[in-house]
Regions:
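Class II aminoacyl-tRNA synthetase catalytic cores and aaRS-like
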Residues: 1-166
Length: 166
């Protein structure tokens, strides 16, 4: 495992826009999905703000760095430095807020490895309630649960602000 020494997050995953094309960014988060296409590996990186696609290219990275990218698995915690580039028209994903861009990795650090989780960290899964409660720390990473917590925060803040004005 590695450290963040000398690297600091410049953006959250869900905040990178097409206007950032050409900029070098550093993002950190959990590996959500990984797809291996031979000399290319695509990883959806997730943090509290959303998802962004990371591209690992064997030709551009070098063999040792690409081998590290091949070892990535679901829920690994990683830090990535790379250049934002616009996706080609046929690869744009309208279902993602960051679907028009991707980050071409120039540096990868694996901050923490993870065992296979007992359930996938995504919405619309039929997972037993007791299993979700047992692994509450994983359940709280799901987007649906994060939305619920943010809603509760906003309601409580509105109430506090109201009573502060009284």
């Amino acid at each position: 495992m590695e450290t963040l020494e000398g690297m600091s997050r410049s953006h959250h995953c869900g905040e990178i826009k097409k206007s950032d094309t050409g900029k070098e960014v550093t993002v950190c988060g959990w590996v959500s999905h990984r797809r291996d296409h031979g000399g290319l590996i695509f990883v959806d990186l997730r943090d509290r703000s959303g998802l962004v696609q990371i591209v690992y290219d064997a030709a551009a990275m070098g063999e040792e760095a690409f081998h590290k990218a091949e070892s990535l698995r679901s829920e690994f915690v990683i830090a990535v430095r790379g250049e934002v580039r616009a996706r080609s028209a046929e690869t744009i994903n309208p279902k993602m807020a960051t679907g028009e861009i991707e980050i071409v990795c120039s540096e990868l650090r694996i901050l923490n490895k993870a065992k296979t989780p007992p359930f996938y960290i995504q919405d619309n899964l039929d997972v037993d309630e007791m299993l979700r409660l047992k692994y509450r720390f994983l359940d709280l990473r799901r987007p649906e649960m994060q939305k619920n917590i943010m809603l509760r925060h906003r309601v409580a803040k509105i109430m506090r602000d109201y009573f502060d004005r009284q």
